[in-house]
From Swiss-Prot:
Keywords annotated in UniProt: Ribonucleoprotein, Ribosomal protein
One cellular component (GO) term of this entry: cytosolic large ribosomal subunit
GO BP terms in the entry: translation
Family to which this protein belongs: Belongs to the universal ribosomal protein uL30 family.
PANTHER family membership: LARGE RIBOSOMAL SUBUNIT PROTEIN UL30M, MITOCHONDRIAL RIBOSOMAL PROTEIN L30
NCBIfam families in the record: rpmD_bact
Quaternary structure (record): Part of the 50S ribosomal subunit.
Sample GO molecular function, one term: structural constituent of ribosome
Keyword Ribosomal protein: yes
Source species of the chain: Coxiella burnetii (strain RSA 493 / Nine Mile phase I)
Protein's recorded name: Large ribosomal subunit protein uL30
Length: 63
């Protein structure tokens, strides 16, 4: 069985004062507060959201 690749994403800057579309991407990734870390599957949709708000995030790739 092949394991899905995961990405560990941490919100390092505040979502307040950002564009509504950027806030929606942050919420779509499951991030609710500063310095919260979540693991998301490495899919094109998640990669797109991460790329859009990459200036607010710290990303660690996992195997």
């Amino acid at each position: 069985m092949v394991q899905e690749k995961k990405l560990r994403v941490t919100l390092v800057k505040s979502k307040y004062g950002r564009k509504p579309g950027h806030r929606e991407c942050i919420e779509g990734l499951g991030l609710r507060r500063m310095h919260q870390t979540v693991e998301v599957t490495d899919t094109p949709a998640n990669r797109g959201m991460i790329e859009k708000v990459s200036y607010l995030l710290m990303i660690d790739e996992e195997v």
